């Protein structure tokens, strides 16, 4: 008998090979579904997907709430479970889709935190040295703020993606979707300086074409970038909550605050749905209200 665990491996393979989803998305699916399957097998004592019912899933969601999971976390789990069971039905590995009448809890969209322009300038000016690490860190921060790309896209850049003389970079976003993003003079100079005077020294005996590397000469990881960002933010006394996406959020917010077209920002960010980009318009409206309340004599 085919087990639910076997089905999970088939599902993840399909998402990677057939749909071309990113490794981060695959890992997220895997984490949520492994927890779900563990519950189904251990608590409900179900081994086959054909025996999973709507009640099974509702029990699992109740279990997540008892654990104190946030609605956003539960909504993500339901989305993964639904996608999994739809796949099983399509592949005739199940007789029905038990998620049909299971509603996804509405997750309240939290507004992304953006740095002020002054905070961004302080952060970007923090790597001051001419050593390879300072040149690398400066190039990464300038490029992130200049393009709004995701950290996973930044660390995935290869030498053939960088077109400094033409003023753009090419990056592969979610689902391997390619996009071309313009970059300004400051970011161009920072990347040029790193490539000319930093990368070669960090590479040591390694041989690959990733742009940003660690002290072993290997491609930099997300964890490596995150560690660097936290340290630099601490150096310039930025005490706001930071995430690896902070500069991406700041890029979008500052463009819109200065009158950029929403569709153009959507394209640069690589958002499939403009409603995702519209979150940033709420950020700018919140900022406007704060300015009004602070400076208007009759506010």
UniProtKB/Swiss-Prot annotation:
UniProt-listed GO biological process terms: cell division; chromosome segregation; DNA transposition
Q: Where in the cell is it found?
A: Cytoplasm
Name this polypeptide is given:
Tyrosine recombinase XerD
Q: Report the principal subcellular site.
A: cytoplasm
**Coiled-coil positions:** none
| Active-site residues, Swiss-Prot/TrEMBL | 150, 174, 245, 248, 271, 280 (o-(3'-phospho-dna)-tyrosine intermediate)
**Biological role:** Site-specific tyrosine recombinase, which acts by catalyzing the cutting and rejoining of the recombining DNA molecules. The XerC-XerD complex is essential to convert dimers of the bacterial chromosome into monomers to permit their segregation at cell division. It also contributes to the segregational stability of plasmids.
Any Gene Ontology CC annotation: cytoplasm
The subunit field of the Swiss-Prot or TrEMBL record says: Forms a cyclic heterotetrameric complex composed of two molecules of XerC and two molecules of XerD.
Provide the alphabetized UniProt keywords.
Cell cycle, Cell division, Chromosome partition, Cytoplasm, DNA integration, DNA recombination, DNA-binding
The residue ranges of the Tyr recombinase domain are 110-293
A single MF term (Gene Ontology):
DNA binding
The segment(s) forming the Core-binding (CB) domain are 2-89
Protein encoded by which gene: xerD
Domain of life per record: Bacteria
Family from the record: Belongs to the 'phage' integrase family. XerD subfamily.
- Check the record and name the PANTHER family matching this protein: PHAGE INTEGRASE-RELATED, TYROSINE RECOMBINASE XERC
Please give the InterPro entries that the UniProt record associates with this protein.
Answer: CB, DNA_brk_join_enz, Integrase-like_cat_sf, Integrase_catalytic, Integrase_recombinase_N, Integrase_SAM-like_N, Recomb_XerC, Recomb_XerD
